[in-house]
Amino acid sequence: MASNEGVENRPFPYLTVDADLLSNLRQSAAEGLFHSFDLLVGKDAREAGIKFEVLLGVYTNAIQYVRFLETALAVSCVNTEFKDLSRMTDGKIQFRISVPTIAHGDGRRPSKQRTFIVVKNCHKHHISTEMELSMLDLEILHSIPETPVEYAEYVGAVKTVASALQFGVDALERGLINTVLSVKLRHAPPMFILQTLADPTFTERGFSKTVKSDLIAMFKRHLLEHSFFLDRAENMGSGFSQYVRSRLSEMVAAVSGESVLKGVSTYTTAKGGEPVGGVFIVTDNVLRQLLTFLGEEADNQIMGPSSYASFVVRGENLVTAVSYGRVMRTFEHFMARIVDSPEKAGSTKSDLPAVAAGVEDQPRVPISAAVIKLGNHAVAVESLQKMYNDTQSPYPLNRRMQYSYYFPVGLFMPNPKYTTSAAIKMLDNPTQQLPVEAWIVNKNNLLLAFNLQNALKVLCHPRLHTPAHTLNSLNAAPAPRDRRETYSLQHRRPNHMNVLVIVDEFYDNKYAAPVTDIALKCGLPTEDFLHPSNYDLLRLELHPLYDIYIGRDAGERARHRAVHRLMVGNLPTPLAPAAFQEARGQQFETATSLAHVVDQAVIETVQDTAYDTAYPAFFYVVEAMIHGFEEKFVMNVPLVSLCINTYWERAGRLAFVNSFSMIKFICRHLGNNAISKEAYSMYRKIYGELIALEQALMRLAGSDVVGDESVGQYVCALLDPNLLPPVAYTDIFTHLLTVSDRAPQIIIGNEVYADTLAAPQFIERVGNMDEMAAQFVALYGYRVNGDHDHDFRLHLGPYVDEGHADVLEKIFYYVFLPTCTNAHMCGLGVDFQHVAQTLAYNGPAFSHHFTRDEDILDNLENGTLRDLLEISDLRPTVGMIRDLSASFMTCPTFTRTVRVSVDNDVTQQLAPNPADKRTEQTVLVNGLVAFAFSERTRAVTQCLFHAIPFHMFYGDPRVAATMHQDVATFVMRNPQQRAVEAFNRPEQLFAEYREWHRSPMGKYAAECLPSLVSISGMTAMHIKMSPMAYIAQAKLKIHPGVAMTVVRTDEILSENILFSSRASTSMFIGTPNVSRREARVDAVTFEVHHEMASIDTGLSYSSTMTPARVAAITTDMGIHTQDFFSVFPAEAFGNQQVNDYIKAKVGAQRNGTLLRDPRTYLAGMTNVNGAPGLCHGQQATCEIIVTPVTADVAYFQKSNSPRGRAACVVSCENYNQEVAEGLIYDHSRPDAAYEYRSTVNPWASQLGSLGDIMYNSSYRQTAVPGLYSPCRAFFNKEELLRNNRGLYNMVNEYSQRLGGHPATSNTEVQFVVIAGTDVFLEQPCSFLQEAFPALSASSRALIDEFMSVKQTHAPIHYGHYIIEEVAPVRRILKFGNKVVF
């Protein structure tokens, strides 16, 4: 204590204060200061500065660090003065541990006593402060004041110097507190780790991979359930106090109460003298909440030492040992205790000198501190935040944490036949049961809808539409799979034009029946498709927009290639089932205001007609003779009317319903009561339905123009002029070459017609009968004598532009007819020469002895024509047959096939292989599409017609088998070929990987229930998977065909609690060292260095930390989506006008501004200007992962990897990168989290998949995503493996320290926080490779019900779902006066 006598008598009076050692050091320090003034002599400022160092040294020697002793933080320390600290170099202290044993009475051999020497590392800490003293003040101190003014200056100088010195001392005091707190944090693992690993239930089983898996599960459970427990308690209602006590008690129980200083208890409660078991270091807000929840003891003081003990090193080595819980300072002390007096009981009084000399003589004073009672423990609670706030320094217990959230958009529930809600009265209209948006709540309780419009900046970017990176990844991998496709990869050009020979040669003695991957996928349900046993197919399902296959390059090496799927309908059936396509069709109906013209009766009539085995074969003869010529139809109106009326009256079915041209002519020319009114009404409805569908498609596409082309061809394949109808009677090929800019090629046999200048070489124009009268003889001669097999000219009528008639025809053949008939049809080739002979070469047709009105059957001899008429149950007149025979005058000789190849549109031609940028189709020239034949019909017509299976919709094997015996034999040998999607068609006519329509569409057509919904569904299946299509569908809220997983990372400001048990750290305080840093003319600067050291004295982890409350959420938790046009500005489609249109529509390009900074071509990333203002905080960036619509909704209801497959492999045995990569990427192994499947999203979880190439930085040649990428941590392979390795090492390291008795483990193990723990605490999602479900619902009604404060709510309402938020942060949701926690 300083005495008043120590102050010199001066003329100016001085104020003296009480010397309180624990609260004020100024007076004791000033005593040395004032006595040292005599040492300063002379007037030279520099000399004075040198001499003042002596004064400063005397002053700093008086530093006692009493402020630290006043803090409750000192409860967890044994504080000792160690003047020889600077001489300590070894930095290790040894402790002796005896392991207790259990005596058994079952005859087991007694255990020997085991004693271990545990080494504790001593860590040095250096703190320093700087003090600057003015030379003018020092000179004034040297002067002798004589006047009152000089006295005042003298006193002011003394105060200034003393204040500067006190400033430095205060900084050192704070530095000690900060050092101790840092030491505590270094030894304080997170609560969710420590609580799990400290549980003997786990640790006593060892640490096999099974146990590690359990540990990770417990990590996640504790993280979710116990983080931010004060926020949970606020809204818990009754029981909150017990809940908070329980959480705090768990913290106390999780740490080790064992210490090598067992007998030391330097802090006790003022009332009762109960030892203080530890201290909670908290923030101010947490302190207020704790005291509000729990209250504090009546006596809010604790008793503690008023000074430091003294630590003296004696002997060559310092050995501190623990024996039977007693502390010993030296081996001599150990020998005296154990050998000389082994039965003498030790006490605190006798043990303390072993640690520090003079402890028993330390005075004890009361210290103000909050104390709470947890069970039988009294624990101090203190906040040190004010000290950090005063110094404008960050408080170590305030942390920034990042949590990743995810939610799905657009998932399809296959059988939404029920609801769990009794409150929602949503219209149960099926059109509303396919979700197209997700409703979420931002941090300010604003309800937001994330829909397709928000995702356009990702979905419309070229990176999503290119397979180049995917193919590079596959080709860089080891050898491709063993099974390689050989069938249907490429079209094979025939060297002749005889289609009958092509079909005969293909099916004759054909035994092999390969099935394409596309077809194999169609036959699998979603569960089987995603099963590990299906890895052979799954491994190439990497991109939603591309079918990937293995081809061969010029060197005959196997190379992966990709062809665009073009339309939504070509998505694999397991990932886009039929029910989903129909739901899209219903959305299409609603969005485009489609009012169907046909009714179910018309559809059923068409279906009955298609499956009528007695369908009159003579109708095909009539249709062949007319073959799309309106003039010939008018010539044969009586016969056509007879056919329609007879078939309608006899069977109630529609004739010629298989031909668009016939229906069109019937509607145009037979409306004058020539046929039955009911039948005509049905034809009109069919034609009206085509018009309605065409208008709906036009409303979907809009009226925009891109360049000189309508945007419709980019939106829907039916509006694309490059897709031709499957049957041609007029010269649509030359018209295509004229209007298309996509390099069309008309492949006729082995010739290519690609230039309209070559039209005379390939097209033989056939005009009206009057025009062709002069050529009848030449035509006859050609039919009889021509080399038809090698004549590559096509006999076609002139193309007639009738507005949108081409679109109507395509809708008929690609939508209406296959849907209503279940694609139960096949192409039909016609031998016109034999048909003409059948019709004309008979008596009534030639002879003038028969009048036109006579019934031809009454005068017809036995023959093919009679058989045809009889099985068709027709009785035409002689005149009708004559007119029909006359129609043959301009008929071709045979049906031919033409292969049409065109470039994909510019948004779909990003495949690297030129051949894969084109799409092909086969067009039947002067042929028909027909229904199945009966046995009787085939016997009669086998010389007239032959099967041509040329298209997915017009190649039903069951129908073809009724027309061709070789096909029937082939199908019988290979029963699996009965499926439309699997049926092998001649490669000269069909190559599935090049077709517009592929197996999924064929399977849908074959299996759908003919209905209005199916028609709408098939129409919607023709919508393209292109940026323009996504833009159009976003505008009308139509599902794009794929779902999305939205990933967002939010930042949380958390306030944490640190608990440290008593005497868990020994702090050694050395002596200060003063040095002059700088001496100037006007001032002198000194640095005071102080050396300290710390030793962790716990026998395990004696401190822990856990998040207590959320101070703030800094991000908005909104729907701001990553702009890929800013992230990857250098990538573009091949047409600048298309690029500009897309950017303008998605909002990535502002009109009237500089379109592109030239520097971005080098840097790879544009400067993104933020919003001018923010209302909800920093915008959290959302990123999109394209996901199959069949993804399991339950997957998103708990924390999982957004990739779709678990990526946390800490549970594996000896960690190595190969094993880790196998568990993460090898889909032949089950998902570790869901062993019944490999993945929930093959488009994101596999190496080289779309999600992988979008967010794995190894594929980014130019830049990483914008300012922040929430998906990068889940996809970047290097970062993912690094986090896995870090978590694996972390669990192993903690397990080493906590897996058994400390003494039996490595004696060099130190109980410190393992590297990476801070990252684990602040970014747990990166380590666990999981994102937390965010509150979202596919319908706002479900959110409203969730907010209705009911005990239960509706997780499912038909096709809609709600996903509750399961995250460490428990938000309070408030809409109006409704509150949900």
Swiss-Prot record:
Signal sequence annotation: none
Key words of the record: Capsid protein, Host nucleus, T=16 icosahedral capsid protein, Virion
HAMAP family named among the record's database cross-references: HSV_MCP
Subunit structure: Homomultimer. Makes the hexons and eleven out of twelve pentons. Interacts with triplex proteins 1/TRX1 and 2/TRX2; adjacent capsomers are linked together in groups of three by triplexes, heterotrimeric complexes composed of one molecule of TRX1 and two molecules of TRX2. Interacts with scaffold protein; this interaction allows efficient MCP transport to the host nucleus. Interacts with capsid vertex component 2/CVC2. Interacts with the small capsomere-interacting protein/SCP.
This protein's name: Major capsid protein
Function comment: Self-assembles to form an icosahedral capsid with a T=16 symmetry, about 200 nm in diameter, and consisting of 150 hexons and 12 pentons (total of 162 capsomers). Hexons form the edges and faces of the capsid and are each composed of six MCP molecules. In contrast, one penton is found at each of the 12 vertices. Eleven of the pentons are MCP pentamers, while the last vertex is occupied by the portal complex.
Subcellular locations according to the entry: Virion; Host nucleus
Residues spanning the membrane: none
Keyword Ribonucleoprotein: no
Molecular function terms from GO: structural molecule activity
Source organism superkingdom: Viruses
Protein family per UniProt: Belongs to the herpesviridae major capsid protein family.
GO cellular component: host cell nucleus; T=16 icosahedral viral capsid
Pfam families attached to this UniProt entry: Herpes_MCP
Originating species: Epstein-Barr virus (strain AG876)
